[in-house]
Amino acid sequence: MEQKRYALIVAGGHGLRMGADRPKQFLLLAGLPVLMHTLNRFAPHVDAIVLVLPTDHHAYWQELCRKYDFSVSHRVVAGGNTRFASVRNGLQVVPDGVLVAVHDGVRPLVSAETIDACFDLAELKGAVAPCRPMTESLRYYATDGNYAVDRSRYVTVQTPQTFRSEWLREAYRQPYEEYFTDDCSVYEHHFGRPVALIVGNIENIKLTTPLDLSLAKLLLTS
């Protein structure tokens, strides 16, 4: 029997690098706030959506939903001071025995194929992340200089990072460490085992700078 599928969308950033007058998840992209594009991408593929937002953004989000007549069903949960705390808060309303895909709210171009592939492999493996091969040259910085490294041995990791919900909740019970940069690092530190990887879609960029936003607009309208 197929497990139910949940999306846990984390949108706690303030977008300082974007240089805008509002958090980047609320910036307009092709006529809609970025975050609405993200929820729209997941809605056909999941049984429920949990949206984690800072408490001081809740009223503004409700206002945007009314303004844009946004009707995708979702539950809003209060975020924490860090991404780690925000995901942990979101997991409190996700039941055991389901698959949960944790996704950055400012990745609005994730494809249906990437979402489905993460869930499908998580049914078998229990822990999955999408990634992309490196295309730039890499160098390692050390105290005595810097050195070229073999880029074929490295990938960049995207979201949605998808897990059996009870596994991820258990991992998030451990104390926070500064090197927890994503859900995979939290999971691996707790269980001592790697996640499975799939190739994600190249358009699944995280909107961090004005250039990212311009590229996303081009991709959506081309």
Swiss-Prot record:
Annotated InterPro entries: IspD (IPR001228), IspD/TarI (IPR034683), IspD/TarI_cytidylyltransf_bact (IPR050088), Nucleotide-diphossugar_trans (IPR029044)
Pathway assigned to this chain's UniProt record? Isoprenoid biosynthesis; isopentenyl diphosphate biosynthesis via DXP pathway; isopentenyl diphosphate from 1-deoxy-D-xylulose 5-phosphate: step 2/6
Which parts of the sequence are marked as the site Positions MEP for the nucleophilic attack? R151, K206
Q: Which CDD domains is this protein grouped with?
A: CDP-ME_synthetase (cd02516)
A GO biological process held by the record: isopentenyl diphosphate biosynthetic process, methylerythritol 4-phosphate pathway
What the entry lists under SUPFAM superfamilies is as follows: Nucleotide-diphospho-sugar transferases (SSF53448)
| Coiled coil, from the record | none
- Give the signal peptide as a residue range, or say none if absent: none
Catalysed reaction, written as an equation? 2-C-methyl-D-erythritol 4-phosphate + CTP + H(+) = 4-CDP-2-C-methyl-D-erythritol + diphosphate
EC number(s) in its UniProt entry? 2.7.7.60
Q: Which UniProt keywords apply?
A: Isoprene biosynthesis, Nucleotidyltransferase, Transferase
- Site residues, Transition state stabilizer: R17, K24
GO molecular function (one): 2-C-methyl-D-erythritol 4-phosphate cytidylyltransferase activity
Q: Could you say which protein family the record assigns here?
A: Belongs to the IspD/TarI cytidylyltransferase family. IspD subfamily.
- What does the function comment of this entry state? Catalyzes the formation of 4-diphosphocytidyl-2-C-methyl-D-erythritol from CTP and 2-C-methyl-D-erythritol 4-phosphate (MEP).
| Protein name per Swiss-Prot or TrEMBL | 2-C-methyl-D-erythritol 4-phosphate cytidylyltransferase
Q: What organism does this protein naturally occur in?
A: Porphyromonas gingivalis (strain ATCC BAA-308 / W83)
According to the entry, what is the taxonomic lineage of the organism? Bacteria, Pseudomonadati, Bacteroidota, Bacteroidia, Bacteroidales
